[in-house]
């Protein structure tokens, strides 16, 4: 669009950090969420209209730095919300909040764009029957299964394997479901974004030789960017994911890292716009903003968007309004444990702390439910006995408790699994384990059929047959 021919032109009356006020003389004001274009010293600056102030004035939040802007500079109404490229050409590329490539690989040859502000799917278009989203990762599928079109919270500190788990999920959805993934980096460190990109290229998730064969599109709005960009980058990633779901009719994985930063950016913008703060200084519109994002993440008759959201919990306070509002939308939680990572058990998913609303007999079936409950009971009993073992030794336990400990240690090791994306580091070929094989394997351990096998045979294997074969090599 040639904005020079656009007759809806205003000028800046005030600049306060990333917020600009503009007055439009024509009386035809830009609509809320319209993108405004301002000529900055390093090229055009895009702002988004947030408030209509009266007297032909609007207040907008900038998506990039406002350095060098002055009163009286012309402002052009683009007469449309921020729109971003969508489709297969986004795969293997990195974009900013405006959908502009930032990986120095040139423009995307996409003619299709969509506005980032869209309505959630109509109720009649939703797929309401709960279905499990099989990941091929034993610990997830058995103990905290993901819902197709659901929202999963990913909890874990630094260095416990979040990135590797995310990359394995991206790999598995592409291979097993023919789906694609979109990664939204919201307000996290630029270094982490760069590391993730490099690791994705190493593991083959991004195919450098043929970008269209890549399995993921990346959208970054990092913590050095203005709050407007961090607040909207999640919507940019979601819009790209919606296209794959609605037009390409694919299953999509949407990663948001970190959903707390989305709330934090909204809080900054709210204060800059002069709104009265709510509890703990958060924006009064916290629930509305979170709902507008989360309600668009769902299964429809066409396809699904399953979202995995890293959740930072400020000061480990789960009652803080930001994580508390997020929990209301989650169907499952995957908690990564530093203790398991220290033992070398990867993925370091905590089997007792991770939860899922899908783990009900009516949804997963009686066999799956009973197996999962027995696994949790065995691991919980082992956890209770660990203090006694540490003080008195395992010989002081009853015969029954010794058997529980023996099986729990096998279960703990069998919950580990070699990943495809970690082949480069471990040298072990990755394994995708279907749900039926997972349930069968744990039932055999719980039933005592494998009591004579050494526990190290269960470490970093795929299905139970591999563990049995591995045990034979120890005997030889």
From Swiss-Prot:
It comes from Fucus vesiculosus (Bladder wrack). F-type ATPases have 2 components, CF(1) - the catalytic core - and CF(0) - the membrane proton channel. CF(1) has five subunits: alpha(3), beta(3), gamma(1), delta(1), epsilon(1). CF(0) has four main subunits: a(1), b(1), b'(1) and c(9-12). It is found in: Plastid, Chloroplast thylakoid membrane. GO terms for biological process: proton motive force-driven mitochondrial ATP synthesis. GO terms for molecular function: ATP binding; ATP hydrolysis activity; proton-transporting ATP synthase activity, rotational mechanism. Produces ATP from ADP in the presence of a proton gradient across the membrane. The catalytic sites are hosted primarily by the beta subunits. Keywords: ATP synthesis, ATP-binding, CF(1), Chloroplast, Hydrogen ion transport, Ion transport, Membrane, Nucleotide-binding, Plastid, Thylakoid, Translocase, Transport. This is ATP synthase subunit beta, chloroplastic. NCBIfam families: atpD. ATP binds at residues 156-163. One of its GO terms (cellular component) is proton-transporting ATP synthase complex.
